[in-house]
A protein has these predicted regions:
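Exposed loop/turn and edge beta-strand positions of beta-sandwich/beta-sheet ligand-binding modules
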Residues: 40, 70, 103
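N-terminal beta-strand motif that seeds the catalytic metal site of vicinal oxygen chelate
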Residues: 1-20, 71-76, 123-127
Length: 127
């Protein structure tokens, strides 16, 4: 049976550069690529050497997604939850849904387009 791994997720945002800057600050990611999309629009890829988010935009991308559309949320693990929350707040976004549970802690935030993100930190380095 084949074994797989998530390589990337492509999401539509109104301002890829703004979203990329937040993800680079929040996660220590780098820009991997940017350019014209295959058919129309523009994309930037941010991530690490193994996986990434493709941040796509085009004239038809308006943002203001409803909860659960186009997806429920995207989750990331970090090694410094307080530092991550400060970065989110400094970007003018509002952290919410804080929870301390076994085995970790988390919070959520909506980006400028209404996309929900979860930020998690696990005790003992189990990420």
């Amino acid at each position: 049976m084949p074994k797989g791994k998530l390589e990337h997720v492509n999401i539509s945002v109104t301002a890829p550069e703004r979203s990329a800057a937040l993800l680079q600050d929040l996660l220590g990611w780098k820009e991997r690529w940017r350019g014209d999309s295959q058919k129309y629009g523009w994309t930037t890829h941010v991530g690490d050497d193994h996986d990434y988010l493709a941040l796509y935009t085009g004239d038809h991308v308006t943002g203001q997604y409803s909860k659960g559309a186009p997806l429920n949320h995207v989750a990331f693990t970090v090694d410094d939850l307080d530092g991550a929350e400060a970065i989110v707040a400094e970007a003018g976004l509002k952290p919410f849904g804080h929870d301390d549970y076994d085995p970790g802690k988390r919070f959520y935030f909506f980006d400028w387009d209404g996309i929900e993100f979860e930020v998690v930190s696990y005790a003992g380095g189990a990420q």
